[in-house]
Amino acid sequence: MMPIMPPTRLSPQELINELQSSGVRLVDPRAGVESRRGGAGPSDHKAMTIDGQTVMVPVHTAPAFDSPYLVEAPDAFGRSRVRRGDVVLGEVEFPGRPRFYDLKTDDGVPYSQIAVLHGRDVLATTVLQTCIRYQSRTKTCQFCSIGQSLSAGRTIARKTPEQLGEVAKAAVELDGVTHMVMTTGTPPGKDRGAKILAESVAGVKARVDLPVQVQCEPPDDFAWLQRMKDAGADALGMHLEAVTPEVRRKIMPGKAEVSVDTYFAAFEAAVPIFGRGQVSTYILAGLGDSVDEILSVSRRLVDIGVYPFVVPFVPISGTPLESHPTPSPQFMHAILRPLAGMLVDAGLKSVDVKAGCAKCGACSALSTYEKAEGGCGSRLAAE
């Protein structure tokens, strides 16, 4: 009989980095909250908690199907061991199904078609499930699956402010949700979704005191930034996705029409309105930008008070990039470790963000790298 190899534990940031790059195979796919397929945001993932940090880990992607990492079925205490062959690398737990998913609006729309739980305590919604970019093959972002969940009947095309307020109130009261992410497909018009978001966040704030991040492309008129803030938005995300013009034109030809320079002008206008660290941008590592290019742009962002939320690219089934390789854990480590140092040195820490993707941190190991760099204390709590 061969001896069982002793456990070899990875640090939390190492384990999260490995699993998010390679995905996992599940012995019991029914464990925890049902995983998402399609839609905006983290899709084809499953929420798992590692060392107190809830993260999104790919389970339905091509790399995940061949992943060397296996998550065992939960034991009697709800813990599952993560193995690579005979080696135990760590443990995960699965957040439970939220209670607000059992409710419907008066007109019969399930709450889960209006907003969903991300991570452990974050409510997320795509206010407008259609997008001018997605509807054109020559303009679509090749990584995006915003239309998939709509086509499958898992969501509705337009969420009203009243619906969003109703669901947000229930999610806070029943499941202890602590903040909300509100994104949108880009509609026709120069406000690029800011108007819909302002109306929507006002609908939520009328029903419940819940911090909300809004996410859109930079509007042509930066006055919309103040209007969203005045409507109740606590934080703002304007997502570059990729940092170099060449990669942006190749991967997201429609969205690339709004240049990197325009994004930086919008960032500089937004930071005085929302505050340092309350403006963020999502950067997908692994689309073609180099480590140095991502870190160089991140430095520019940090210097003006914008939080660069760098996540590993995860290919989503049914998109043009479904077979695109994921970045290696080594590639992500080469970005996340120095980036975490930049953020901690600048006082831009995820723990201080009021709402949104950077605060949630589930799609990247970045916040755990911050903690390793000594960035676990909250500046806001000390003030």
Positions of PLM-derived features:
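Generic detector of short, locally flexible boundary/turn motifs and exposed helical patches
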Residues: 42-49, 88-91, 107, 144-148, ...
